[in-house]
Amino acid sequence: MPTINQLVKHGREKVKEKSKSPALQGHPQKRGVCVRVSTMTPKKPNSALRKIAKVRLSNGIEVTAYIPGIGHNLQEHSIVLVRGGRVKDLPGVRYKIIRGALDAAGVENRRQSRSKYGAKRPKAGAAAGAKGKK
């Protein structure tokens, strides 16, 4: 326990907040180049082949990023925009690729939550035809 004099002289050390996405270095997004595009299996109770990409960011750091949505057009040397945000059942994946930006195309035939997947607004006629399908 410090004395009052010690506190006056030195003060208390602030606890630094640890970043959840350190590779972005405080930026909201970073551009990167896909080094490798592959799949990965999730943690214990879940089972799937989640699509991931190893991305070399513009600051030289290499990260593993998740490719959200159904289907993608990414391959090696694709330029992508990466944002923070982990995937709970994939250990070590702390970043996501933004769909609909740079080389990552938006998700096809996406009707709901379109903004999250870079999907354009469907034509009025196309939406009416798809409404009956369930």
UniProtKB/Swiss-Prot annotation:
Q: Name one GO biological process term.
A: translation
The annotated region (Disordered) lies at 1-30, 106-134
Q: Which superkingdom heads the taxonomic lineage of this protein's source? A: Bacteria
Q: Where is the composition biased (Low complexity)?
A: 124-134
Query: InterPro entries, from UniProt?
Result: NA-bd_OB-fold (IPR012340), Ribosomal_uS12 (IPR006032), Ribosomal_uS12_bac (IPR005679)
The name this protein carries in UniProt is Small ribosomal subunit protein uS12
Might you report a single GO cellular component term? small ribosomal subunit
Residues modified as 3-methylthioaspartic acid are 89
The role this protein plays is: With S4 and S5 plays an important role in translational accuracy.
S-S bonds = none
Basic residues compositional bias, start-end:
112-123
Q: Quaternary state and partners of this protein?
A: Part of the 30S ribosomal subunit. Contacts proteins S8 and S17. May interact with IF1 in the 30S initiation complex.
Q: Which UniProt keywords apply?
A: Methylation, Ribonucleoprotein, Ribosomal protein, RNA-binding, rRNA-binding, tRNA-binding
